[in-house]
Amino acid sequence: MRHANGDRLDQFEILDVLGQGAYAETYLARNAETGQQVVIKSPDPNLFADPGIFQRYKRETEIARSINHPGVQRALDGGEHRSEPYLVLEYVEGTNLRAVMRELTAQHGAIPIDVVIDWGEQLASALEYLHAHGIVHRDLKPENVLATAGGALKVADFGTALLDGAKRLTWKHLTDGIGTPDYMSPEQIQGERGDERSDIYAWGVMMYEFAAGAVPFRGDNWMATMAGHLTKSPPPLTQRRHEVPAALDAVVRKAMRRYPDHRYSKIADARHDLEHLDEVDPSTFDLGPEPPMGGLAAASERRRLIVLVGGVAGAFIALVAIIIALSVLL
């Protein structure tokens, strides 16, 4: 770590180390002038020799400073100390959503359905705000959601987010397939940038995991997991857990349709259905089988997928170039 407890970044005193990723270190700090506790995100300046990483940092800073919503972690300040840039974020007293999921599962055997619905509504509200402001998160997962002791959720970590109209970043030998395999939309796996519907897909995967206790597609390795998103349909939640309402199952699986045009076009529509489950008629939802994405199920067909994968909790990015022989995985 570049900083120790007691170090100062301008008026901010480092209190503790919160984490270290592939791209930045995160610290708990205190504003010596106001006494306010904050989070300092300090990117490794050596990485800025790569123009792509520098642009990604600038983009995250721009995104974070533009946000003002109770369901999204806020940026408070930013600066540069001895040629090292840093971002000051709202300190959220609590933990990440993954830890809360484990705790509730240990207590109740499964996350209560009313909690599943509440979390879904909170996350949908945050995404609705982000999308209305031209921001696509592109890496929504429990590790990137903060949870307070009072049950409030805040979406965080915009290292892979996309601003509407932002210039496409090009990574050497890589496409824009960015995300985490368990939650990546099929179009992201295929190297597309993704749009609001990619976030809706990830929201659906999270909702499925909340209700079922497991993600819908989990292979022996992350290549097999991604192949599942491209070729398989999730088992109905009502088969995984008998107390899941059929209406909730329909909403979640519509959000997770393989092809973007088959999903909700707006997260606001998914939120509305979630808030009015008693009015949702599952028989009106088209949840039938979908063809594999791009015909990838053909046993003799091999396709090259070059992806950018962030698969370690707390890491901003992990760059991986791969060639997947899908016929071996299916």
Task: Annotate the PLM regions.
Residues 180-285:
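C-terminal lobe helix-coil module of Hanks-type protein kinase domains
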Residues 125-135:
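Protein kinase catalytic-loop region centered on the HRD/HxD motif
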